[in-house]
Amino acid sequence: VSAPRQVVVLGASGFLGSAVVRELAADPTVRVRAVSRRPVPLPERLAGRVEVLTGDLTERDVLARAVAGADAVLPFTARIRGASGWRLSEDDQEAERVNVGLVRDLVALLAERPPGAGGPPAVVFPASNTQVGRVTAERIDGSEPDRPEGVYDRQKHAAESLLKQAAARGLARAVSLRLPPVYGPGTATADDRGVVSTMIRRALAGEPLTMWHDGTVRRDLLYVEDAARAFTTALAHAEALSGRHFLIGTGRARPLGEVFGAVAHAVSRHTGAEPVPVVSVEPPAQADPTDFRSLEVDPSAFTAATGWRARTALDEALDRTVSAVAREAGAASRP
């Protein structure tokens, strides 16, 4: 099993996209093309292995140039939050254009490939485990019927469906990886804005960590390096996985009260100060019912097919993330 030679990462300056670029660039048999609005920061040892293109991928000619000659495409471009910084609204046309339209354009470009341009490329898509919608069980394995509820989940589901149809037509070897919340060190172009890093920033500032519930709501949280490795693993197995979606996660959801407590202690280990308190507060008016439902991921189908599994322990992942966030905060405070 081997990864494709020319791999194009779209949205390569984002939090997860940049981690996947680093993972791919470490493989000398792979040529990486990193495409985004902003240049992708790379360690000096990897910079010579990556072709960097900048441009607006919602412009079809830019996308066409980006994916020309690709053996594989990983589309990480996404709009997650609305203009208010909160969840997407129904009338957010820019979000639809980025989250669905870009994949629609990609499929159209693949359909226009001339005969003899090589076999169908691998496409590994970052989906969300919440696009299943409301489920009665707290543990899901990917076999459940999908009933996506929120705008973002419906858009992810629509894009995933387009790629499954492309696989059925023989246009791509398309695989969808449905991710839980991913956390870890950010980059110069993309902070991790998820709940874990948000709480780390609060703890570093000496502020209490607030929960909208009693702390028993459980979440499966995945370290960014484990997530990036899932994508490179899926690329290497794209032929066998094509046309399907797989759940990715640790297989163990943790109570958020326990996670926040672990964050407080990780920051305490870094600073030497006492751990900040973890407290329950009233939820804001815009809180969603999904914020109060537990969800655990069973990734065994993907593990059985590829051998991948999450391998970074929570405390180790938190220590790495705390160190990175503290460095960012220190750099930002210097004149």
Annotate each predicted stretch with a short phrase:
Residues 6, 27, 313-335:
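Amphipathic terminal alpha-helices
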Residues 7-26:
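N-terminal Rossmann NAD(P)H-binding glycine-rich loop of SDR-like oxidoreductase domains
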Residues 50, 54-98:
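NAD(P)H-binding glycine-rich loop region in Rossmannoid oxidoreductase-like domains
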Residues 75, 104-151:
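Conserved Rossmann-fold NAD(P)-dependent oxidoreductase catalytic core, especially the SDR/UDP-sugar
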Residues 134, 149-175, 204:
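Active-site Tyr-X1-5-Lys
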Residues 157, 170, 182-197, 207, ...:
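Glycine/proline-rich active-site loop of Rossmann-fold NAD(P)-dependent oxidoreductases
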Residues 186-193, 215-228, 244-266, 311-312, ...:
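Substrate-binding strand-loop-helix patch
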Residues 237-287:
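Mid/C-terminal beta-alpha module of Rossmann-like enzyme folds, strongest
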